[in-house]
Amino acid sequence: MVRSQAADYGFQLNEFDPFFNFRATQYLLDHGVNAYVHWHDTMSWYPNGRDVYSTSQVPLHFTAAFLYKIFGAGSSLYDFTIIFPVVFGSLTAIIVFALVRVMGGTTAGLFASLFFAISPPIIVRGTIGWFKSEPLGLFYGLLGLYLFLSGLKSQNRKIAFGKLIGGGLFLAIGFASWGGVEFFLMPLALFIIALPFFRKDHKFLLWAIPLFVAVTLAVSGGFARPGISFVLGVRGFALIGPTIFLVAMIFIQKFSREGTALRNSLAILGGSIIAGVAIISSNILHAPSFRYLNAINPFLTSQDALVDSVAEHATPNLTQNFTYFSTLMLFAGLGIWLIFRKRSENQNSLPIGIKNEMTIFALIIGIVGAYAGGTFARLDLLTATSVIILASIGLAVITSEILKKRTQVKSPEISKKGTQGKTSDNSKKGTAQSKKSTYALGMFASISYVVIIVALLLVPTIYPVNGNWISVTKSPPTILNGGSNYAISTNDWPVTLDWIKNNTPPNSVIASWWDYGYWIQTLGGRTTLADNATLDTNIIAKIAKIFLSSPDEAWRMLHDWGANYVLVYVVGQEFSSNGQQLYVLGGGGDESKKQWFMRIAGEDSSKFLQDDQFTPTDYFWQNTLLGKMFPFTPVTYFDPNTHVQSATYQSGYIGVYSKTIKYPVDGNGPLKLVYSSPSLNSNSSGIISGVLLYQINPNYVLQTSNTNIPTPQVNSTTINPTTVNPTSVNPTSDVGVISTKYGNIVIKFRDDVAPKTVANFEKLAKSGFYDGTIFHRIIPGFVIQGGDPNTKSGSRDTWGTGDAGYTIPPEFSTLKHVKYMVSMARGPSINSASSQFFIMIGDAPNLDGKYTIFGQVISGQDVVDKIGAIKTDPATDQPIDPEEARMSKVIIQSQATQSTTSPTNTSSTG
């Protein structure tokens, strides 16, 4: 019931990832296994798409699809996936009982299952609707651990063999279900290293551990994710290295003389540590992703703004840890102390039977779990599992000690009558010794202990009223509160996504911050530029750059990308003052994420934000696309303590805004507001959870200059463009040869359709104008653009603005902008072409009839491709190393001359 509290707000999937997992499971059921394995999802990461099988949690989709076939019972898949995590959370509590029972006995197992059922970190990531990787991954991972430890403990070698194979199998499936399960690699590695010191049956270990490790690696490598990189990388080495050490240690101990065994063992241990560090430091092993490295080293968080921006990657604070684990930490600490105190006094005095190696494993997983949870908030559930194991064993030890019973024996009375050494008949009836059991510490102390324990367990579940273990796990499904900070339930997102599904063309592409990608794809049925898989940080940085760019620049970038709509989400509070509706912004929408946009895009936040790092500056409101998309205008600023108002921002003041639609649907701006969600259209006071959808105006005419497209002054005489069809006349015999470090690019001119443009290019080339310039704008799959004289010596912020000092008229034709065609770049006006040109490295029909095609690459296409693959700054599309994209010389040759003087192979061999 605790896990199902979110259903009070509405029966929906929760968070973001579950919507993709639902869509993927539906695809698997509808199209079958073969189609799923080869599924390239074109609705995500437009235009590249996504290989689902290699980038998602495959076992989650297969498990859900398999169980739905069996237990679906006529329910919809959507409803089934909502209940799925609650069911597996309950099943995992049973696995936890079995796991801890193996380590600490039945009492410890019962305590563990109880703690697991009410632990806030476990519940938060396993509530109803949480159809994500954690619940199933933790189930498989803990099941694998249980079978592994149970196999080591089993006296029957055949049963042990089966359990070890099962343990490796399910642990590997856990790895593939949720990457967080790989946390278990650390305690497993340390445990395997410790085993030869605490287990004497070395013959068993010699085959048991290698068997378990081999199965784990084989199954893990069989999945596309984690895949073979797991086996051959640092993570696989975390199992292979300790296994090699264990085998070596056993042989060293076996063949060493009694007096040298310890010395040799320590030498092997030290040498293994040095060798392991050397191997990992050499970078010969495949390194895990940044997230895994960040989990090991929390100081890396600030080095990646995208990782740092995700709430679940934040480092938990002391208050949060104390709220979650205070009582459990108390039991865990006391339990550890009692276990080691008893073992130091007398091996046989432990009140419960715990084998040496099980004690060691509990201690290792507890310490490592506490460390892991201190790095990532998302790993709190692993910390909770580790602390629960220690606390349960500790509480079992304490309880056994307190409630231990002492048996007293009462001797029979001997009759004084009769001969010596004999008893009377009556006394014979009492010769049997009487026994009486009492609590070792007395009845009162035992009852008091029970009361105290019950109180310690109950207090966190009822106090404080709004911050106890039960209340903190109750929150609305994210789709109903938009992921905001408010415990509200609105239909803003559902009705917006339904509107998108029914009112936009099916092939529409929607740009938004990546948080909303899965919702738009699944409930809106539309393609997005990025989503919650965060597969390409460069694309996410580019989206952030778009939001912070000028409206004209953002329009150009969106237009070039092929987007049709832009979505933005804003949260705030509406109130009425003197008959006017006013707003205070903040609460978890894009208005609260904008500072992360700036960090991810590499922008200086001081230009956009006031000194509180939240309140937008006038520049933000007037000069950024995001500021224009937010339908608000500053009215005043006030001090929340003194209620003093100011027309301008003062430190510590809060902004107050009025509603202003800056891009109305009937306007001629770069965007048109085509839909806004209900709470934005309400005139009642309260929380707003507003979703706005803007159409990108395809007919918009740029009004400002652009740094990526040349923007020379337009001649005072407006020249009307004409469209020319290619004639049967042969084009000029001249060709242009562009020399680069990768080889030559040979361009065949088309003066049959663009004679003035060809003549202009030849004139500039012959004068040396292009020599030393670079391809300053490189967009993979789109264009490489060059011809700006500013790239010879000007600063990067001037690249794309230079020209020849004059302009030429357009010469549109029916030629198509397909790969390797050469066309003239221009500014906002169609009459503004001058010197800059671009070579297509992909098809772009949206450019046809708008830009002048004047040539085609007939040789050196491989050189074009190499330049198109140069590493660029995602925020500007400029090459990181300009020399990679430099045109050393551009010459004009007749085709006959070129064929005799140009090298046979125009690409370089270097």
Write out the residue ranges for each language-model feature.
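Membrane-embedded helix bundles of polyisoprenyl
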Residues: 1, 36-44, 83-102, 107-155, ...
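Membrane-interface coil-to-helix junctions
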Residues: 1-91, 119, 132
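Transmembrane signal-anchor helices characteristic of membrane glycosylation enzymes that use polyprenol
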Residues: 1-18, 23-26, 30-36, 40, ...
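Extracytoplasmic
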Residues: 91-94, 410-716, 721
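Membrane-interface helix-loop-helix junctions at transmembrane boundaries of multi-pass membrane enzymes
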Residues: 158-159, 201-207, 258-266, 330-364
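Alpha-helical transmembrane segments at the extracellular/periplasmic loop-to-helix junctions
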Residues: 235-252, 265-345, 358-359
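Hydrophobic/aromatic-rich transmembrane helices and adjacent perimembrane loops
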Residues: 363, 367-368, 372-406, 451
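Cyclophilin-like peptidyl-prolyl cis-trans isomerases
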Residues: 710-910
